[in-house]
Amino acid sequence: MIKVKIVRLKEKASLPAYATAHAAGMDVSACLDAPVTLEPSSSALIPTGLAIELPEGYEAQLRPRSGLALRHLISLPNSPATIDADYRGEVGVILINHGREPFTVNHGDRIAQMVVSKVDRVAFEEVDSLSDTERGEGGFGHTGVASKAE
């Protein structure tokens, strides 16, 4: 288990927490002075009242909560949102309402999941060509939608 330093920028901010013993993501909560209503097709930056210090070589990703997506069509437009190890500002969550009804976020609502992962840096090697594969340049749905097991 890695240690991540965290500062409550507001006393009432909730620390991220795993909901179950084997959860990959920690629930992240809104830290609001007043409710925020997302009208259909609108987005807002929701504060968490938290700042974190990740160890070098790690990132945190913010991801949508499946229940909010399923029941209310609330998501993160930049999912996964990356928090870099050298960022020290407040963690904010951009929420978007893809639904047809207004959705209100209240203080303490669990609005996203945070997954902390190790990341490797890469060094690109510029070459004249790439090796051939069966797939080649096929992309963007080239394998179709129907199951191949039919």
UniProtKB/Swiss-Prot annotation:
Residues 130-150 are annotated as: Disordered. Its EC number is 3.6.1.23. Pathway: Pyrimidine metabolism; dUMP biosynthesis; dUMP from dCTP (dUTP route): step 2/2. It catalyses: dUTP + H2O = dUMP + diphosphate + H(+). Its cofactor is Mg(2+). The keyword NAD does not apply. One of its GO terms (molecular function) is dUTP diphosphatase activity. InterPro entries: dUTPase, dUTPase-like, dUTPase-like_sf, dUTPase_trimeric. It comes from the Bacteria. Substrate binds at residues 65-67, 78, 82-84. Keywords: Hydrolase, Magnesium, Metal-binding, Nucleotide metabolism. Belongs to the dUTPase family. This enzyme is involved in nucleotide metabolism: it produces dUMP, the immediate precursor of thymidine nucleotides and it decreases the intracellular concentration of dUTP so that uracil cannot be incorporated into DNA. This is Deoxyuridine 5'-triphosphate nucleotidohydrolase. The gene is dut.
